[in-house]
Protein backbone atom coordinates (compact mmCIF):
# COMPACT_ATOMS: atom_id res chain seq x y z
CA UNK A 1 0.00 0.00 0.00
CA UNK A 2 1.32 3.42 -0.88
CA UNK A 3 1.87 5.40 2.33
CA UNK A 4 1.52 8.71 0.52
CA UNK A 5 -1.88 8.30 -1.18
CA UNK A 6 -5.27 8.57 0.51
CA UNK A 7 -8.54 7.90 -1.29
CA UNK A 8 -11.31 9.58 0.71
CA UNK A 9 -14.86 9.21 -0.55
CA UNK A 10 -18.54 9.42 0.31
CA UNK A 11 -20.92 7.06 -1.44
CA UNK A 12 -24.70 6.89 -1.17
CA UNK A 13 -25.47 4.10 -3.63
CA UNK A 14 -22.02 2.43 -3.84
CA UNK A 15 -21.14 3.92 -7.26
CA UNK A 16 -18.56 6.29 -5.79
CA UNK A 17 -17.33 3.52 -3.49
CA UNK A 18 -16.69 1.24 -6.48
CA UNK A 19 -14.78 4.06 -8.18
CA UNK A 20 -12.70 4.60 -5.00
CA UNK A 21 -12.00 0.87 -4.69
CA UNK A 22 -10.69 0.75 -8.25
CA UNK A 23 -8.45 3.77 -7.63
CA UNK A 24 -7.09 2.05 -4.51
CA UNK A 25 -6.42 -1.16 -6.43
CA UNK A 26 -4.52 0.68 -9.15
CA UNK A 27 -2.56 3.07 -6.90
CA UNK A 28 -2.03 1.10 -3.70
CA UNK A 29 -3.49 4.04 -1.79
CA UNK A 30 -5.34 3.79 1.50
CA UNK A 31 -9.15 3.97 1.46
CA UNK A 32 -11.09 6.12 3.89
CA UNK A 33 -14.88 6.21 3.71
CA UNK A 34 -16.44 9.51 4.76
CA UNK A 35 -19.44 8.64 6.94
CA UNK A 36 -21.89 11.24 8.24
CA UNK A 37 -23.19 10.90 11.79
CA UNK A 38 -26.76 10.90 10.50
CA UNK A 39 -27.30 8.63 7.48
CA UNK A 40 -29.52 9.75 4.64
CA UNK A 41 -32.86 8.05 4.11
CA UNK A 42 -32.80 4.77 2.21
CA UNK A 43 -35.74 6.06 0.17
CA UNK A 44 -34.26 7.84 -2.86
CA UNK A 45 -36.96 10.54 -3.07
CA UNK A 46 -36.67 11.36 0.63
CA UNK A 47 -32.87 11.37 0.43
CA UNK A 48 -32.89 13.80 -2.51
CA UNK A 49 -35.09 16.21 -0.53
CA UNK A 50 -32.75 15.96 2.47
CA UNK A 51 -29.67 16.53 0.32
CA UNK A 52 -31.16 19.45 -1.62
CA UNK A 53 -32.06 21.20 1.65
CA UNK A 54 -28.55 20.64 3.04
CA UNK A 55 -26.87 21.95 -0.10
CA UNK A 56 -29.12 25.02 -0.27
CA UNK A 57 -28.22 26.04 3.28
CA UNK A 58 -24.53 25.05 3.04
CA UNK A 59 -24.91 22.46 5.78
CA UNK A 60 -21.90 20.34 6.77
CA UNK A 61 -22.91 17.23 8.72
CA UNK A 62 -20.89 15.86 11.62
CA UNK A 63 -18.74 12.90 10.58
CA UNK A 64 -18.20 9.59 12.37
CA UNK A 65 -15.47 8.68 9.87
CA UNK A 66 -13.33 10.99 7.80
CA UNK A 67 -11.99 13.30 10.46
CA UNK A 68 -8.86 11.25 11.14
CA UNK A 69 -5.54 13.03 10.48
CA UNK A 70 -4.25 13.26 6.91
CA UNK A 71 -0.76 14.55 7.68
CA UNK A 72 0.96 11.37 6.42
CA UNK A 73 -0.44 11.76 2.89
CA UNK A 74 0.98 13.84 0.06
CA UNK A 75 -1.79 13.04 -2.44
CA UNK A 76 -5.48 12.88 -1.54
CA UNK A 77 -8.08 11.62 -3.99
CA UNK A 78 -11.47 13.06 -3.03
CA UNK A 79 -14.59 11.26 -4.25
CA UNK A 80 -18.17 12.45 -4.23
CA UNK A 81 -21.39 11.83 -6.07
CA UNK A 82 -22.58 14.83 -8.08
CA UNK A 83 -25.69 15.90 -6.21
CA UNK A 84 -27.55 18.77 -7.84
CA UNK A 85 -24.27 19.85 -9.52
CA UNK A 86 -22.69 20.08 -6.05
CA UNK A 87 -20.35 18.16 -3.82
CA UNK A 88 -22.03 15.86 -1.28
CA UNK A 89 -22.37 17.61 2.11
CA UNK A 90 -20.33 14.91 3.95
CA UNK A 91 -17.43 15.55 1.55
CA UNK A 92 -17.70 19.29 2.22
CA UNK A 93 -17.42 18.45 5.94
CA UNK A 94 -14.28 16.42 5.19
CA UNK A 95 -12.75 19.31 3.24
CA UNK A 96 -13.45 21.75 6.05
CA UNK A 97 -12.06 19.38 8.71
CA UNK A 98 -8.54 19.29 7.24
CA UNK A 99 -5.70 21.53 6.13
CA UNK A 100 -4.78 20.59 2.57
CA UNK A 101 -1.96 23.13 2.22
CA UNK A 102 0.85 21.77 0.07
CA UNK A 103 -1.04 18.56 -0.68
CA UNK A 104 -2.02 17.36 -4.12
CA UNK A 105 -5.79 16.91 -4.44
CA UNK A 106 -7.36 14.76 -7.11
CA UNK A 107 -11.16 14.95 -7.37
CA UNK A 108 -13.31 12.16 -8.76
CA UNK A 109 -17.06 11.87 -8.96
CA UNK A 110 -19.92 9.75 -10.12
CA UNK A 111 -22.93 11.24 -11.82
CA UNK A 112 -26.11 10.49 -13.69
CA UNK A 113 -25.26 12.75 -16.63
CA UNK A 114 -24.09 15.98 -15.01
CA UNK A 115 -20.33 15.43 -15.06
CA UNK A 116 -18.45 17.34 -12.38
CA UNK A 117 -21.00 20.13 -12.06
CA UNK A 118 -19.45 22.54 -9.53
CA UNK A 119 -17.46 19.89 -7.61
CA UNK A 120 -13.98 20.84 -8.84
CA UNK A 121 -14.68 24.54 -8.29
CA UNK A 122 -15.91 23.81 -4.75
CA UNK A 123 -12.79 21.80 -3.90
CA UNK A 124 -10.55 24.55 -5.30
CA UNK A 125 -12.41 27.15 -3.25
CA UNK A 126 -12.32 25.14 0.00
CA UNK A 127 -8.69 24.04 -0.37
CA UNK A 128 -6.95 27.10 -1.78
CA UNK A 129 -3.49 26.08 -0.51
CA UNK A 130 -3.53 22.74 -2.32
CA UNK A 131 -2.37 21.73 -5.78
CA UNK A 132 -5.49 20.60 -7.67
CA UNK A 133 -5.09 18.01 -10.42
CA UNK A 134 -7.84 17.71 -13.08
CA UNK A 135 -10.25 15.04 -11.93
CA UNK A 136 -12.30 12.31 -13.53
CA UNK A 137 -16.09 12.08 -13.61
CA UNK A 138 -17.80 8.80 -14.50
CA UNK A 139 -21.37 7.71 -14.96
CA UNK A 140 -22.79 4.55 -13.40
CA UNK A 141 -20.16 2.16 -14.75
CA UNK A 142 -16.41 2.48 -14.43
CA UNK A 143 -14.44 2.59 -17.66
CA UNK A 144 -11.28 0.84 -16.45
CA UNK A 145 -9.23 1.83 -19.51
CA UNK A 146 -10.14 5.50 -19.06
CA UNK A 147 -9.39 5.27 -15.34
CA UNK A 148 -6.00 3.68 -16.02
CA UNK A 149 -5.07 6.42 -18.55
CA UNK A 150 -6.09 9.12 -16.07
CA UNK A 151 -4.10 7.56 -13.23
CA UNK A 152 -1.05 7.11 -15.47
CA UNK A 153 -0.82 10.88 -15.72
CA UNK A 154 -1.04 11.33 -11.96
CA UNK A 155 0.71 8.61 -9.97
CA UNK A 156 2.78 6.52 -12.34
What are these regions (language model features)?
Residues 106-143:
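Short, glycine-/small-residue-rich phosphate/pyrophosphate-handling segment
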Amino acid sequence: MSPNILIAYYSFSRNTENFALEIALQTGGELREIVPEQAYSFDYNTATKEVRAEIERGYCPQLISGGEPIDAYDTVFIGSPNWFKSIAPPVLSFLRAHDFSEKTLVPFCTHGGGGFGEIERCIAQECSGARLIPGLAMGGTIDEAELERWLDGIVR
